[in-house]
Curated annotation (Swiss-Prot), chain A:
This is Frizzled-5. It is a multi-pass membrane protein. The chain crosses the membrane at residues 249-269, 281-301, 328-348, 371-391, 415-435, 462-482, 513-533. It comes from Danio rerio (Zebrafish). PANTHER family: FRIZZLED (PTHR11309), FRIZZLED-5 (PTHR11309:SF136). InterPro entries: Frizzled/SFRP, Frizzled/Smoothened_7TM, Frizzled_dom, Frizzled_dom_sf, GPCR_2-like_7TM. Disulfide bonds join 45-106, 53-99, 90-128, 117-158, 121-145. Disruption phenotype: During gastrulation, morphants display a reduction in the eye field within the anterior neural plate (ANP), while other ANP regions are essentially normal. Later on, at 3 dpf, they exhibit coloboma and microphthalmia phenotypes.
From Swiss-Prot, chain B:
Residues 1-25 form the signal peptide. GO terms for molecular function: cytokine activity; frizzled binding. Belongs to the Wnt family. It comes from Danio rerio. This is Protein Wnt-8a. A lipid is attached at residue 187 (O-palmitoleoyl serine). GO terms for cellular component: apoptotic body; cell surface; extracellular space. GO terms for biological process: anterior/posterior pattern specification; brain segmentation; canonical Wnt signaling pathway; cell fate commitment; cell migration involved in gastrulation; cell proliferation involved in pronephros development; central nervous system development; determination of dorsal identity.
Length: 592, 359
């Protein structure tokens, strides 16, 4: 009912002035309707105006592109940043690839997207990505090749010149000019960035063992690849790092040699001065003298002559060898004397425990010295002979020495890590027991009067030295644990990935860990020298020189020196009747 | 017919506006009213049309497939139904109008509106800031409400339901806004991004409202208070009922009729003769079961028809740069709902069929 009334009202109202307005509205409505129809929002092809992308093979594009650029001016600002790369001709496909991404092709009769093929992207990336990485840029993620269709995909069409059935010349790149230079570059770069395939194979810098006559044939594998050897130098470290390694090892080994040589020489000219329980420090220093000598031999002979075999591209690290004399010599010096030094440290902690904890006198401890020497020299001998018999000596690609366990995890764990852990644990037990006893009997010692001050100081000095030894020893063990845990993955990465990817993912060994290991291996030898830093050393050398020159005429003074030395050993400063008394007192303690 | 119907509705809407004014002079109306309102008419018309097309797509494989009769929002014939499907029509139409107005606003088609720059330059998140041209949905919402709600001039519960569903459609456009970003940085890196809010595809809005259609709620009005008609009590009842419904949900008042059966008085054509999908790749479960839903459950059988189609195939790209396709003729099988024939003239045949049924 209401609507008929409205219609009636409408009819009445239109008569008069409003009639003109009504028809005017209708006219405007029709006009606007026409305008609306013409404004369609479909893809509109427009000529390419970006200067860099003119003449790439097609002339029309549409906006917005996949990067949400609204117009070609915006596209030009961004795509022009790649102009230096295009100019340098790192890849003949780069320009077409960039323009097909930024100014996508627009065809009137084909409305589906038509991106470049994945092969075009991969060719451009292979040629230009290494250059971008040199300047600190990575291949943009939003231009990753994985999102592009494959050539020949029927569902998603794509652009690549190889898909053309008829061979047509590409207008942007005439044949002679770009093909020469890019080929040369490709040849130069063919080895290192071999298009980053993830297939595992014996690729550079690994050394393939191809000849069956090669002594390592079917005997060596890297990253679980058979007949694949590691190169002479650690492939993860750069040339600068290798040079610094040589300097680093040279620095500490020379310092160690000088320090330990001084200590041993001082001991030799005045053997009576160093008695048990401190005497093992001297033997420990002697061991480090020979260890540093092993490193010095490597420095003089060179990395390649000690640790490597072969020539040119076929040069590789030594595996399971006993032949080369230099290699064996360096191995024996470093391994035998290194292990002996560890055992001497255990002996030191044991003798210190006897003296400080069990209140043994130096004479009683000295009575067992032949057993200490037997253990300290025999055990490393057996182990060294075992390593040589098992042909487990191999080259270290970092330090350039020969050792055990560089290429064999079993060798590393069995001959290096396990003994070090056992020695460290045993010595620490003795130290702990000794300190507990020391605190317990502290009051008893003090009751003896001022005579016990020197003894207590000596005990504390030896204990401090022995405890400080545990720091580098623990660090060496930690470095070895780190190395044996990650080495398989390092080797696998060498075989299964390319250098740029390894560098990006950081899947290599930590350079600092190795430098720390070599320093800690030698620092004990350096610090053992502080043991002889005292006025006594000067007196010993002065006496040695005086005794050497007038041998005949001073027999009585020698006797006097020995008497004085005894008094000094007894830890008393008084002469005359005091020495006799002290000697008398010590007899009962040794008896106990 | 559709544009004419909506066009007529719009014209009547504008005329009503003119008639409702009391102090308007012809000059004032021509200077302000026509320019301000006529500028949006084509967008409103195009938006409503896109809503209709989306409705047909969303209900292509339903028994009710958005027939023409449902699109006559205001008709002089018969009663306007307030079913679940009508609720969807109102929502998708309002969404279409708002969508088109907002998009045309961002495209610069209107002089008095532009991008939504309320957030320009502000920090949005880590590594990105607000910028660009955010779609001005508030403008589209305001103008769409002005035009679409003007079609409802009643004050009964039916009008209130329609207005509610109109608002739900507009809220669907806002709910589906998405953030789009553009990268800035040297050599294509994405060191910093500029982001803006952008309308989703209208298909996404249609799918969103289709879910709302499936979840629509039926209003249970107090029948006693409804008798009061257009009185104050009735309006109070309407207000009480609507306050309990979320603005984003669709509501309806009447149950849907049986869409299997033809009912020309209600503008329904039934499912006989409708096409359905039997098999094929990339079919959703709803599409795969369309034959059962449209034919078997409506007492009809599925009839196969072989149709030849011509299409482009084996497209290849030729360097550089053309795409050449072949023209292929394929025979495709399509399925339609057909009546089951029951011929009882031969007595023997009748017996035979009965026997089959027993077995």
């Amino acid at each position: 009912m209401r609507k008929p009334a409205d219609e009636h009202h409408f009819t009445m109202e239109t008569s008069g002035m409003h009639l003109v307005g009504f028809w005017l509205h209708v006219l405007l409505l029709f006009q606007l309707s026409g305008l609306g129809d013409s404004a369609s929002k479909d893809i509109v092809c427009e000529p390419i105006t970006v200067p860099m992308c003119k003449g790439i093979g097609y002339n029309h594009t549409y906006m917005p592109n996949q990067f949400n650029h609204d117009n070609q001016d915006e596209v030009g600002l961004e795509v022009h940043q790649f102009w230096p790369l295009v100019r340098i001709h790192c890849s003949p496909d780069l320009l077409f690839f960039l323009c097909s991404m930024y100014t996508p092709i627009c065809l009137q009769d084909y409305k589906k997207p038509l991106p470049p093929c994945r092969s075009v992207c991969e060719r451009a990336k292979r040629g230009c990505s290494p250059l971008m990485i040199q300047y600190g840029f990575e291949w943009p993620e939003r231009m990753s090749c994985e999102q592009l269709p494959m050539l020949g995909d029927t569902d998603r069409l794509c652009m690549d010149r190889n898909s053309s059935e008829t061979t047509t010349l590409s207008p942007p790149f005439p044949k002679p000019t770009p093909k020469g230079t890019p080929r040369h570059r490709a040849t130069a770069k063919s080895a290192p960035p071999q298009k980053c395939d993830r297939e595992c194979h014996c690729r550079g810098p690994l050394v393939p063992i191809k000849k069956e006559a090669h002594p390592l044939h079917n005997r060596v594998n890297t990253g679980s690849l058979p007949n694949c050897a590691l190169p002479c130098h650690q492939p993860y470290f750069s040339q600068d790092e290798r040079t610094f390694t040589t300097f680093w090892i040279g620095l500490w080994s020379v310092l160690c040699f000088v320090s330990t040589f001084t200590t041993v020489a001082t001991f030799l000219i005045d053997m009576e001065r160093f008695k048990y329980p401190e005497r093992p420090i001297i033997f420990l220093a002697a061991c480090y003298l020979f260890v540093s000598l092993g490193y010095i031999v490597r420095l003089l002979a060179g990395h390649e002559r000690v640790a490597c075999e072969g020539t040119g591209d076929q040069q590789h690290i030594l595996y399971d060898t006993t032949g080369p004399a230099l290699c064996t010599l360096v191995f024996l010096l470093i391994y035998f004397f290194g292990m002996a030094s560890s055992i001497w440290w255990v002996v030191l902690s044991f003798t210190w425990f006897l003296a400080a904890g069990m209140k043994w006198g130096n004479e009683a401890i000295a009575g067992y010295s032949q057993y200490f020497h037997l253990a300290a020299w025999l055990v490393p001998s057996v182990k060294s002979i075992a390593v040589l018999a098992l042909s487990s000596v191999d080259g270290d690609p970092v330090a350039g020495i020969c050792y055990v366990g560089n290429q064999s995890l079993e060798g590393l764990r069995g001959f290096v890590l396990a003994p070090l852990v056992v020695y460290l644990f045993t010595g620490s037990l003795f130290l702990l027991a000794g300190f507990v006893s020391l605190f317990r009997i502290r009051s008893v010692i003090k009751q003896g009067g001022t005579k016990t001050d020197k003894l207590e100081k000596l005990m504390i000095r030896i204990g401090l030295f022995t405890v400080l030894y545990t720091v580098p020893a623990t660090i060496v063990v930690a470095c070895l644990v780190y190395e044996q845990h990650y080495r398989p993955s390092w080797e696998r990465a060498l075989a299964c990935s390319c250098p740029s990817e390894r560098q990006r993912l950081g899947m290599g060994p930590d350079y600092a860990v190795f430098m720390l290991k070599y320093f800690m291996c030698l620092v004990v030898g350096i610090t053992s020298g502080v043991w002889i830093w005292s006025g006594k050393t000067l007196e010993s050398w002065r006496r040695f020189i005086a005794r050497y020159v007038p041998c005949r005429t001073r027999k009585p003074p020698v006797s006097a020196s020995s008497m004085y030395s005894e008094a000094s050993t007894a830890l008393t400063a008084r002469a005359g009747t005091a020495p006799t008394g002290t000697y008398h007192k010590s007899a009962p303690s040794s008896h106990v | 017919m559709n544009p004419c119907q909506i066009f007529a509705s719009l014209v009547m809407s504008i005329c009503c506006h003119i008639l409702s004014s009391t102090a308007w002079s012809v000059n004032n109306f021509l200077m302000t009213g026509p320019k301000a309102y006529l500028a949006y008419t084509s967008s409103v018309q195009a938006g409503a049309q896109s809503g209709i097309e989306e409705c047909k797509h969303q209900f292509a494989w339903d028994r009710w497939n958005c027939p023409e009769s449902a699109l006559q929002l205001s008709t002089h014939k018969g009663l306007r139904s307030a079913t679940r499907e009508t609720a969807f029509v109102h929502a998708i139409s309002a969404a279409g109008v708002m969508y088109t107005l907002t998009k045309n606003c961002s495209m610069g088609d209107f002089e008095n509106c532009g991008c939504d720059d309320s957030k320009i330059g502000k920090m949005g998140g880590r590594g990105w800031v607000w910028g660009g041209c955010s779609d001005n949905v508030n403008f589209g919402d305001r103008i769409a409400k002005l035009f679409v709600d003007a079609l409802e001039n009643g004050h009964d519960s039916r009008a209130a339901v329609n207005l509610h569903n109109n608002e739900a459609g507009r809220l669907a456009v806002k709910a589906t806004l998405k953030r789009t970003c553009k990268c800035h940085g040297l050599s294509g890196s994405c060191s910093i991004q500029t982001c803006w809010m952008q309308l989703a595809d209208f298909r996404d809005i249609g799918s969103y409202l289709k879910i709302k259609h499936d979840q629509a709620r039926k209003l249970e009005m107090d029948k006693i208070r409804m008798r009061a008609g257009n009185s104050a009590d009735n309006r109070g009842a309407i207000a009480d009922t609507f306050s309990a419904v979320a603005r984003t949900e669709l509501i309806f008042m009447e149950d849907s009729p049986d869409y299997c059966v033809k009912n020309l008085s209600m503008g329904l054509h039934g499912t006989e003769g409708r096409e359905c999908l039997q098999s094929g790749k990339n079919l959703s479960q709803w599409e795969r079961r369309s034959c059962r839903r449209l034919c078997h459950e409506c007492g009809l059988k599925v009839e196969e028809r072989r149709i030849e189609t011509v299409s482009s195939c084996n497209c290849k790209f030729h360097w550089c740069c053309t795409v050449k396709c072949e023209t292929c003729t394929q025979t495709v099988t399509r399925y339609f709902c057909a009546k089951r024939h029951r011929n009882r003239r031969p007595h023997n045949h009748s017996r035979k069929r009965q026997h089959t049924r027993r077995g």
